[in-house]
Amino acid sequence: HVCLEVDDVYQAIIELKDSGVEVLNDIPKIGAEGFKVIFIHPKFTGGVLVELAERPA
């Protein structure tokens, strides 16, 4: 599993979906240290689970 930090997880969801990429959760969950997180479906990332995380304000 790989985690990448993004500035705006909601914008990332929109951009991914507009590009035809499936995310596992449309609504971010609160992860470690309060980060908002989503996951990209592994079928779009060569079998790797990719997490996108937005730092808490």
Task: Give the label of every model feature segment.
Residues H1-A57:
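Vicinal oxygen chelate
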